[in-house]
Design a protein with these regions (language model features):
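Internal acidic/polar
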Residues: 6-7, 96-123
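Short, Lys/Arg-enriched C-terminal cap helix and immediately downstream tail that follows
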Residues: 91-94, 140, 145, 175, ...
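C-terminal edge and immediately downstream basic/flexible tail or linker adjoining helix-turn-helix-like DNA-binding
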Residues: 1-7, 16, 98-101, 132, ...
Length: 192
C-alpha cells in the first residue's frame, strides 16, 4: 500500500480564508480564476454563463471553506465545485444530450495512416491548430462537447461522467467516441 504525498502550496491562504481574511480570498481568486473560467467555458461555451458560474463557485467555495479538510489540493476541491456548478447550469438550460441515433456519421474510425510524425510544428503553427480545435469544439452539439470536455480536459472517467450527467457509462463512451469523430470532421472541413 502506497501513500500519496502532495504539497499544497496554498495551505496558508486556505487557513487564512478559514479565519475570514478577505485578502487571502482575493489571492486564491487571482490564482485560480483564469483556470476555472477555462473549465466553465469548456463545459458551457457561453461567456456570460461561465462568468456567472465562476463567481457562484468561488462564493460557494469560500462559504464552505471551513469544511475543506485539505485531503486534496484547494485547486482540486474548487474544480469539483466549478464542474458541478457548470453541469447544474446546463441542466437549468434544460438542454438534453444529443440522441446519437439521430446522426449518421458514416464509417467506424478515422484512418490515421496518413499521419507523418516527421512533420514538425512551430509555436505559431501549434497556436493556430489549438485555435482551430477550440473553434471546432464550439460547433459540437452540447452533449458531445460536455462529455468530450469532461473526459479529455477535466480527467473524469466514463463512470463519473455518467453519474454527473445522469447517463449510463456506455452512453458516455459512445458520446465521447462520436464527439471525437465529429470534431475531426469539423476540423478537416475548416478552411482558414
Amino acid at each position: 500500500m502506497t501513500n500519496t504525498v502532495f504539497i499544497n502550496k496554498h495551505a496558508d491562504l486556505v487557513e487564512q480564508c478559514k479565519r475570514g481574511e478577505s485578502k487571502a480570498q482575493y489571492e486564491l481568486y487571482k490564482h485560480y480564476s483564469k483556470a476555472m473560467f477555462s473549465v466553465c467555458m469548456r463545459i458551457l461555451n457561453h461567456v456570460g454563463e461561465a462568468e456567472d458560474v465562476l463567481q457562484e463557485a468561488f462564493i460557494d467555495a469560500f462559504a464552505k471553506i471551513k469544511d475543506f479538510r485539505q485531503q486534496s489540493t484547494f485547486g482540486v476541491w474548487l474544480k469539483q465545485i466549478v464542474v458541478n456548478k457548470a453541469i447544474n447550469q446546463l441542466r437549468a438550460r434544460r438542454v438534453e444530450l444529443v440522441n446519437i441515433d439521430d446522426y449518421d456519421f458514416g464509417g467506424d474510425e478515422y484512418d490515421v495512416a496518413d499521419y507523418d510524425e516527421s512533420e514538425s510544428y512551430s509555436d505559431t503553427d501549434m497556436k493556430y491548430e489549438v485555435e482551430r480545435i477550440r473553434r471546432a469544439m464550439e460547433q459540437l452539439p452540447e452533449g458531445f462537447r460536455v462529455v468530450l470536455s469532461l473526459y479529455l480536459f477535466e480527467g473524469y472517467d466514463h463512470e463519473e461522467i455518467g453519474n454527473i450527467l445522469g447517463i449510463s457509462e456506455t452512453t458516455s463512451r459512445t458520446q465521447y467516441m462520436r464527439a471525437k469523430k465529429r470534431l475531426l470532421e469539423i476540423v478537416k472541413g475548416q478552411l482558414f
